[in-house]
Design a protein with these regions (language model features):
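Active-site cofactor/cluster-binding pocket
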Residues: 1-202
């Protein structure tokens, strides 16, 4: 994929690793020589609060803000949040969505009604939606914290640089934690990439 500027919107719930994933994506873009701008634009990053970040990179980027209808990819760590931000995608762009539900406190407080079928609603709106259960993949690998690496694997083939560049940034991020942690993240990345490839609509 090649864009003058690549616009990625990442959304989810605090504690899922949304900000860490955005940081790693930005590190990969910088490693490839791109000008990078990113910002957290909504919610609070503490566990349970909604988190949304905008990431833009290219030859020269003036603003970190993504305008509605201009995102090239949406990386949704939580299905209802992905639905809520789907209007930011440009026509024909892809949403990669973890379909495991994590209901935020605003729902429990009655401030927001959780949609019955957020993935189905996205598809009915014509959004090119690729969904998979990142939480189960991470759990099967032995650690739910691997979920953000699973999500990074899922987006790897939608970036204007190779998956190996992104994986290298993940390895560098976790290298200080030891080879076992690095290897678990390698497996999570590969599993997420495979899950997304298998779920891409024809």
């Amino acid at each position: 994929m090649t864009f003058e500027t690549t616009n990625i919107l990442v959304c989810g719930i605090g504690g899922q690793g949304v900000m860490t994933a955005t940081e790693i994506l930005s590190e990969a873009a910088i490693a490839e020589g791109h000008d990078v701008k990113k910002t957290e634009v909504a919610g609070m990053s503490q566990r349970g609060g909604v988190v949304t970040s905008h990431l833009r990179f290219g030859r020269k980027v003036l603003s970190p803000q993504i305008a509605p209808g201009t995102a090239d990819v949406l990386l949704g760590f939580e299905a209802a949040e992905a639905l809520r931000w789907a209007h930011y995608l440009k026509p024909g762009a892809m949403a990669l969505v973890n379909d495991a539900r994590l209901v935020p406190p605003v729902v429990e407080l009655g401030l927001f009604k959780y949609p019955d079928d957020p993935i189905g609603e996205m598809k009915s709106r014509g959004v090119r939606t690729v969904s998979f259960d990142a939480a189960t993949i991470a759990r099967d690998l032995g650690d739910l914290r691997l979920g953000n690496t699973v999500m990074l694997g899922a987006i790897a083939d939608q970036l204007p640089f190779s998956a190996e560049v992104l994986l290298d940034c993940i390895v560098k991020r976790f290298a200080r934690k030891g080879e076992q942690v690095v290897e678990m993240n390698r497996k999570a990345f590969a599993a997420g990439r495979e899950a997304a490839q298998a779920a891409v609509p024809a």
